Amino acid sequence: MKPGFSPRGGGFGGRGGFGDRGGRGGGRGGRGGFGGGRGGFGGGGRGRGGGGGGFRGRGGGGGRGGGFQSGGGRGRGGGRGGKRGNQSGKNVMVEPHRHEGVFICRGKEDALVTKNLVPGESVYGEKRVSISEGDDKIEYRAWNPFRSKLAAAILGGVDQIHIKPGAKVLYLGAASGTTVSHVSDIVGPDGLVYAVEFSHRSGRDLINLAKKRTNIIPVIEDARHPHKYRMLIAMVDVIFADVAQPDQTRIVALNAHTFLRNGGHFVISIKANCIDSTASAEAVFASEVKKMQQENMKPQEQLTLEPYERDHAVVVGVYRPPPKAKN
Protein backbone atom coordinates (compact mmCIF):
# COMPACT_ATOMS: atom_id res chain seq x y z
CA MET A 1 0.00 0.00 0.00
CA LYS A 2 1.41 3.40 -0.90
CA PRO A 3 2.30 5.71 1.98
CA GLY A 4 -0.37 8.31 2.62
CA PHE A 5 -3.19 6.17 1.23
CA SER A 6 -5.25 4.75 4.02
CA PRO A 7 -7.84 2.09 3.19
CA ARG A 8 -11.48 3.24 2.77
CA GLY A 9 -13.16 3.57 6.12
CA GLY A 10 -9.92 4.27 7.81
CA GLY A 11 -8.80 0.71 8.46
CA PHE A 12 -6.11 1.68 10.93
CA GLY A 13 -6.71 5.37 10.65
CA GLY A 14 -4.11 5.18 7.97
CA ARG A 15 -1.17 6.41 10.07
CA GLY A 16 -0.18 8.51 7.07
CA GLY A 17 2.95 6.76 5.93
CA PHE A 18 5.97 8.36 7.54
CA GLY A 19 4.72 11.66 8.99
CA ASP A 20 5.32 11.33 12.65
CA ARG A 21 1.93 9.78 13.44
CA GLY A 22 0.33 12.39 11.24
CA GLY A 23 -3.25 12.17 10.96
CA ARG A 24 -4.60 9.35 13.12
CA GLY A 25 -7.33 11.89 12.30
CA GLY A 26 -10.30 10.42 10.57
CA GLY A 27 -10.79 8.23 13.51
CA ARG A 28 -14.38 7.67 14.54
CA GLY A 29 -15.85 9.65 11.76
CA GLY A 30 -16.47 6.80 9.40
CA ARG A 31 -14.65 8.31 6.49
CA GLY A 32 -11.41 7.62 8.32
CA GLY A 33 -9.36 7.36 5.22
CA PHE A 34 -9.02 11.06 4.76
CA GLY A 35 -7.51 11.64 8.15
CA GLY A 36 -4.24 9.89 8.08
CA GLY A 37 -3.76 10.56 4.49
CA ARG A 38 -1.68 13.62 3.99
CA GLY A 39 0.41 12.89 7.01
CA GLY A 40 3.51 12.35 5.03
CA PHE A 41 4.57 15.97 4.81
CA GLY A 42 5.98 18.20 7.46
CA GLY A 43 5.78 16.13 10.56
CA GLY A 44 2.17 15.26 10.06
CA GLY A 45 1.00 18.72 10.99
CA ARG A 46 -1.98 19.32 8.76
CA GLY A 47 -3.50 15.82 9.08
CA ARG A 48 -6.95 17.34 8.45
CA GLY A 49 -8.02 16.34 11.92
CA GLY A 50 -11.11 14.70 13.16
CA GLY A 51 -12.72 14.21 9.80
CA GLY A 52 -15.78 12.71 11.34
CA GLY A 53 -17.20 15.83 12.90
CA GLY A 54 -18.88 16.94 9.76
CA PHE A 55 -21.05 13.88 9.56
CA ARG A 56 -22.84 14.27 12.81
CA GLY A 57 -23.97 17.77 12.03
CA ARG A 58 -21.64 20.68 11.54
CA GLY A 59 -20.37 20.33 15.09
CA GLY A 60 -17.13 21.12 16.79
CA GLY A 61 -14.96 19.23 14.29
CA GLY A 62 -11.47 19.21 15.77
CA GLY A 63 -9.96 21.88 13.52
CA ARG A 64 -7.03 21.00 11.28
CA GLY A 65 -5.12 18.43 13.22
CA GLY A 66 -3.85 20.68 15.90
CA GLY A 67 -2.33 23.49 13.83
CA PHE A 68 1.23 23.11 12.65
CA GLN A 69 3.13 21.70 15.55
CA SER A 70 4.92 18.55 14.50
CA GLY A 71 3.29 15.39 15.60
CA GLY A 72 0.04 16.48 14.08
CA GLY A 73 -1.76 16.71 17.37
CA ARG A 74 -3.66 13.56 16.40
CA GLY A 75 -6.47 15.60 14.93
CA ARG A 76 -8.50 15.81 18.11
CA GLY A 77 -12.19 16.32 18.11
CA GLY A 78 -14.35 15.47 15.23
CA GLY A 79 -15.88 12.68 17.16
CA ARG A 80 -19.05 13.85 18.78
CA GLY A 81 -19.46 17.10 16.91
CA GLY A 82 -23.14 16.73 16.28
CA LYS A 83 -24.53 18.07 19.53
CA ARG A 84 -24.39 21.79 18.91
CA GLY A 85 -25.31 21.60 15.23
CA ASN A 86 -25.57 24.89 13.37
CA GLN A 87 -25.04 26.66 16.62
CA SER A 88 -24.07 30.12 15.49
CA GLY A 89 -27.21 30.60 13.47
CA LYS A 90 -25.33 31.69 10.37
CA ASN A 91 -27.34 31.12 7.20
CA VAL A 92 -30.15 29.73 9.32
CA MET A 93 -33.65 31.16 9.48
CA VAL A 94 -36.38 30.17 11.89
CA GLU A 95 -39.97 30.72 10.84
CA PRO A 96 -43.19 29.92 12.70
CA HIS A 97 -45.09 26.76 11.77
CA ARG A 98 -48.86 27.00 11.41
CA HIS A 99 -49.15 25.24 14.76
CA GLU A 100 -48.54 27.94 17.33
CA GLY A 101 -45.38 27.35 19.37
CA VAL A 102 -43.77 25.11 16.73
CA PHE A 103 -41.13 26.47 14.35
CA ILE A 104 -39.26 25.43 11.22
CA CYS A 105 -35.52 25.96 11.02
CA ARG A 106 -34.44 26.57 7.44
CA GLY A 107 -30.78 25.95 6.76
CA LYS A 108 -28.73 23.38 4.91
CA GLU A 109 -31.40 20.93 6.06
CA ASP A 110 -34.84 21.99 7.26
CA ALA A 111 -35.83 20.82 10.72
CA LEU A 112 -38.80 21.07 13.05
CA VAL A 113 -37.80 22.99 16.20
CA THR A 114 -39.32 24.34 19.42
CA LYS A 115 -38.16 27.36 21.43
CA ASN A 116 -36.02 26.08 24.30
CA LEU A 117 -37.68 26.85 27.64
CA VAL A 118 -34.32 26.31 29.40
CA PRO A 119 -31.63 27.79 27.11
CA GLY A 120 -28.30 26.00 27.22
CA GLU A 121 -29.84 22.66 28.22
CA SER A 122 -30.12 19.72 25.85
CA VAL A 123 -32.60 17.05 27.02
CA TYR A 124 -31.70 13.95 25.01
CA GLY A 125 -28.68 15.02 22.97
CA GLU A 126 -30.68 16.88 20.33
CA LYS A 127 -29.13 19.68 18.28
CA ARG A 128 -29.67 23.27 19.33
CA VAL A 129 -29.60 26.46 17.29
CA SER A 130 -29.21 30.00 18.61
CA ILE A 131 -30.71 32.82 16.58
CA SER A 132 -30.01 36.47 17.35
CA GLU A 133 -33.10 38.64 17.37
CA GLY A 134 -32.02 42.20 18.12
CA ASP A 135 -29.93 42.04 21.29
CA ASP A 136 -31.49 38.78 22.43
CA LYS A 137 -30.40 35.29 21.54
CA ILE A 138 -33.19 32.75 21.26
CA GLU A 139 -32.32 29.06 21.40
CA TYR A 140 -34.31 26.42 19.53
CA ARG A 141 -34.16 22.62 19.90
CA ALA A 142 -34.45 20.25 16.95
CA TRP A 143 -37.42 17.87 17.19
CA ASN A 144 -36.76 14.45 15.72
CA PRO A 145 -39.86 12.81 14.14
CA PHE A 146 -38.28 9.35 14.42
CA ARG A 147 -38.20 9.72 18.20
CA SER A 148 -41.49 11.52 18.72
CA LYS A 149 -44.95 10.54 17.47
CA LEU A 150 -46.17 14.10 17.85
CA ALA A 151 -43.37 15.47 15.65
CA ALA A 152 -44.11 12.72 13.10
CA ALA A 153 -47.79 13.74 13.08
CA ILE A 154 -46.92 17.42 12.58
CA LEU A 155 -44.55 16.64 9.70
CA GLY A 156 -47.19 14.28 8.31
CA GLY A 157 -49.50 17.29 8.03
CA VAL A 158 -51.94 16.83 10.91
CA ASP A 159 -54.57 19.58 10.82
CA GLN A 160 -54.73 20.40 14.55
CA ILE A 161 -52.65 19.35 17.55
CA HIS A 162 -54.53 21.61 20.01
CA ILE A 163 -51.32 21.92 22.06
CA LYS A 164 -50.46 25.62 22.09
CA PRO A 165 -48.90 28.26 24.36
CA GLY A 166 -50.73 28.45 27.69
CA ALA A 167 -52.52 25.09 27.26
CA LYS A 168 -52.84 22.56 30.07
CA VAL A 169 -51.91 19.12 28.74
CA LEU A 170 -52.25 15.66 30.29
CA TYR A 171 -49.60 13.44 28.69
CA LEU A 172 -50.16 9.70 29.19
CA GLY A 173 -47.17 7.43 28.56
CA ALA A 174 -44.50 10.08 29.04
CA ALA A 175 -41.53 7.63 29.11
CA SER A 176 -38.26 9.53 29.70
CA GLY A 177 -39.69 12.82 28.57
CA THR A 178 -38.35 13.21 25.01
CA THR A 179 -41.64 14.46 23.55
CA VAL A 180 -42.78 15.88 26.89
CA SER A 181 -39.83 18.30 26.81
CA HIS A 182 -41.01 19.65 23.43
CA VAL A 183 -44.62 19.91 24.63
CA SER A 184 -43.22 21.84 27.60
CA ASP A 185 -41.47 24.19 25.12
CA ILE A 186 -44.72 24.70 23.18
CA VAL A 187 -47.04 25.44 26.12
CA GLY A 188 -44.39 27.73 27.60
CA PRO A 189 -44.20 29.18 31.12
CA ASP A 190 -47.96 29.86 31.26
CA GLY A 191 -48.94 26.29 30.33
CA LEU A 192 -48.65 23.00 32.23
CA VAL A 193 -47.81 19.43 31.26
CA TYR A 194 -48.95 16.65 33.59
CA ALA A 195 -46.71 13.75 32.56
CA VAL A 196 -47.98 10.30 33.63
CA GLU A 197 -45.57 7.36 33.43
CA PHE A 198 -45.74 3.99 35.20
CA SER A 199 -42.15 2.77 34.76
CA HIS A 200 -39.95 3.87 37.65
CA ARG A 201 -36.81 3.89 35.56
CA SER A 202 -38.28 6.30 33.00
CA GLY A 203 -39.93 8.13 35.87
CA ARG A 204 -36.52 9.00 37.30
CA ASP A 205 -35.54 10.73 34.05
CA LEU A 206 -38.88 12.48 34.03
CA ILE A 207 -38.40 13.81 37.56
CA ASN A 208 -34.91 15.08 36.67
CA LEU A 209 -36.39 16.82 33.64
CA ALA A 210 -39.08 18.44 35.79
CA LYS A 211 -36.42 19.86 38.12
CA LYS A 212 -35.26 22.12 35.30
CA ARG A 213 -38.63 22.67 33.59
CA THR A 214 -41.08 24.09 36.06
CA ASN A 215 -44.11 23.58 33.80
CA ILE A 216 -43.80 19.75 33.90
CA ILE A 217 -45.54 17.89 36.74
CA PRO A 218 -44.38 14.25 36.77
CA VAL A 219 -46.88 11.64 37.97
CA ILE A 220 -45.37 8.17 38.45
CA GLU A 221 -48.59 6.16 38.39
CA ASP A 222 -50.51 3.68 36.25
CA ALA A 223 -52.70 5.59 33.80
CA ARG A 224 -55.32 2.80 34.15
CA HIS A 225 -56.22 4.18 37.58
CA PRO A 226 -56.73 7.93 37.25
CA HIS A 227 -58.46 8.09 40.66
CA LYS A 228 -55.04 7.39 42.25
CA TYR A 229 -53.66 10.73 41.06
CA ARG A 230 -56.82 12.79 40.75
CA MET A 231 -55.70 15.05 43.61
CA LEU A 232 -52.61 16.07 41.62
CA ILE A 233 -54.22 17.12 38.36
CA ALA A 234 -56.62 19.95 37.57
CA MET A 235 -58.92 20.05 34.52
CA VAL A 236 -56.95 20.00 31.26
CA ASP A 237 -57.53 21.26 27.71
CA VAL A 238 -55.81 18.41 25.87
CA ILE A 239 -54.92 14.77 26.50
CA PHE A 240 -52.02 13.34 24.49
CA ALA A 241 -51.70 9.56 24.78
CA ASP A 242 -48.87 7.29 23.68
CA VAL A 243 -49.40 4.27 25.94
CA ALA A 244 -49.16 1.34 23.48
CA GLN A 245 -51.52 -0.93 25.45
CA PRO A 246 -54.28 -3.21 24.13
CA ASP A 247 -56.89 -1.31 26.15
CA GLN A 248 -55.47 2.13 25.46
CA THR A 249 -58.74 3.68 24.27
CA ARG A 250 -60.32 2.68 27.60
CA ILE A 251 -57.34 4.17 29.46
CA VAL A 252 -57.69 7.48 27.59
CA ALA A 253 -61.48 7.50 28.12
CA LEU A 254 -61.11 7.00 31.89
CA ASN A 255 -58.68 9.91 32.06
CA ALA A 256 -60.86 12.04 29.80
CA HIS A 257 -63.92 11.46 32.02
CA THR A 258 -61.86 12.48 35.04
CA PHE A 259 -59.71 15.37 33.81
CA LEU A 260 -60.69 16.61 30.33
CA ARG A 261 -62.99 19.61 30.14
CA ASN A 262 -66.09 19.40 27.94
CA GLY A 263 -65.13 20.56 24.46
CA GLY A 264 -61.49 19.66 25.22
CA HIS A 265 -59.42 17.66 22.73
CA PHE A 266 -57.47 14.43 22.61
CA VAL A 267 -54.56 13.23 20.47
CA ILE A 268 -54.02 9.47 20.60
CA SER A 269 -51.13 7.59 19.02
CA ILE A 270 -52.18 4.04 18.11
CA LYS A 271 -49.71 1.23 17.48
CA ALA A 272 -51.65 -1.46 15.62
CA ASN A 273 -49.38 -4.34 16.73
CA CYS A 274 -49.96 -3.58 20.40
CA ILE A 275 -53.72 -3.83 20.10
CA ASP A 276 -54.16 -6.81 17.80
CA SER A 277 -51.17 -8.24 15.97
CA THR A 278 -53.36 -10.59 13.90
CA ALA A 279 -55.61 -7.98 12.27
CA SER A 280 -54.54 -5.52 9.59
CA ALA A 281 -53.51 -2.08 10.79
CA GLU A 282 -56.48 -0.41 9.05
CA ALA A 283 -58.96 -2.73 10.79
CA VAL A 284 -57.38 -2.00 14.18
CA PHE A 285 -57.53 1.77 13.63
CA ALA A 286 -61.19 1.54 12.57
CA SER A 287 -62.19 -0.52 15.62
CA GLU A 288 -60.37 1.90 17.98
CA VAL A 289 -62.21 4.85 16.43
CA LYS A 290 -65.51 3.01 17.05
CA LYS A 291 -64.59 2.52 20.71
CA MET A 292 -63.83 6.23 21.03
CA GLN A 293 -67.24 7.17 19.68
CA GLN A 294 -68.89 5.04 22.36
CA GLU A 295 -67.04 7.02 25.05
CA ASN A 296 -68.29 10.48 24.04
CA MET A 297 -65.01 11.07 22.20
CA LYS A 298 -65.62 12.34 18.70
CA PRO A 299 -62.68 11.65 16.33
CA GLN A 300 -62.14 14.44 13.81
CA GLU A 301 -59.08 13.25 11.91
CA GLN A 302 -56.88 10.21 11.55
CA LEU A 303 -53.39 10.13 10.08
CA THR A 304 -50.84 7.35 9.61
CA LEU A 305 -47.26 8.10 10.65
CA GLU A 306 -45.44 6.77 7.59
CA PRO A 307 -42.55 7.19 6.82
CA TYR A 308 -41.48 7.69 10.43
CA GLU A 309 -43.27 4.73 12.06
CA ARG A 310 -44.79 1.54 10.64
CA ASP A 311 -48.42 0.66 11.40
CA HIS A 312 -48.93 3.69 13.60
CA ALA A 313 -51.74 6.21 13.38
CA VAL A 314 -52.67 9.36 15.24
CA VAL A 315 -56.33 10.14 15.93
CA VAL A 316 -57.28 13.69 16.91
CA GLY A 317 -60.73 14.54 18.20
CA VAL A 318 -62.95 16.46 20.58
CA TYR A 319 -64.46 15.30 23.89
CA ARG A 320 -68.14 15.97 24.57
CA PRO A 321 -68.47 18.72 21.96
CA PRO A 322 -71.01 21.39 22.90
CA PRO A 323 -74.29 20.98 21.01
CA LYS A 324 -74.46 23.05 17.85
CA ALA A 325 -76.93 25.91 18.12
CA LYS A 326 -79.90 25.39 15.82
CA ASN A 327 -80.68 28.32 13.57
Swiss-Prot record:
GO terms for molecular function: ATPase binding; histone H2AQ104 methyltransferase activity; RNA binding; rRNA methyltransferase activity; TFIID-class transcription factor complex binding; U6 snRNA 2'-O-ribose methyltransferase activity. Its main location: nucleus. The keyword RNA-binding applies. Residues 1-93 are annotated as: Disordered. The modification Asymmetric dimethylarginine is found at residues 8, 15, 21, 24, 28, 31. Ubiquitinated. Ubiquitination leads to proteasomal degradation. Deubiquitinated by USP36. By homology to other fibrillarins, some or all of the N-terminal domain arginines are modified to asymmetric dimethylarginine (DMA). Residues 7-80 have a biased composition (Gly residues). The modification Phosphoserine is found at residues 122, 130, 132. Keywords: Acetylation, Isopeptide bond, Methylation, Methyltransferase, Nucleus, Phosphoprotein, Ribonucleoprotein, RNA-binding, rRNA processing, S-adenosyl-L-methionine, Transferase, Ubl conjugation. Its EC number is 2.1.1.-. There is a cross-link at residues 90, 108, 115, 137, 149, 164 (Glycyl lysine isopeptide (Lys-Gly) (interchain with G-Cter in SUMO2)). One of its GO terms (cellular component) is dense fibrillar component. NCBIfam families: PRK04266.1-2 (NF003276). Component of box C/D small nucleolar ribonucleoprotein (snoRNP) particles that contain SNU13, FBL, NOP5 and NOP56, plus a guide RNA. It is associated with the U3, U8, U13, X and Y small nuclear RNAs. Component of several ribosomal and nucleolar protein complexes. Part of the small subunit (SSU) processome, composed of more than 70 proteins and the RNA chaperone small nucleolar RNA (snoRNA) U3. Interacts with PRMT5 and UTP20. Interacts with DDX5 and C1QBP. Interacts with NOL11. Interacts with PIH1D1. Interacts with RRP1B. Interacts with NOLC1. Interacts with SDE2. Interacts with NOP2 and NOP56. S-adenosyl-L-methionine-dependent methyltransferase that has the ability to methylate both RNAs and proteins. Involved in pre-rRNA processing by catalyzing the site-specific 2'-hydroxyl methylation of ribose moieties in pre-ribosomal RNA. Site specificity is provided by a guide RNA that base pairs with the substrate. Methylation occurs at a characteristic distance from the sequence involved in base pairing with the guide RNA. Probably catalyzes 2'-O-methylation of U6 snRNAs in box C/D RNP complexes. U6 snRNA 2'-O-methylation is required for mRNA splicing fidelity. Belongs to the methyltransferase superfamily. Fibrillarin family. This is rRNA 2'-O-methyltransferase fibrillarin. It comes from Rattus norvegicus (Rat). The lineage of its organism: Eukaryota, Metazoa, Chordata, Craniata, Vertebrata. The gene is Fbl.
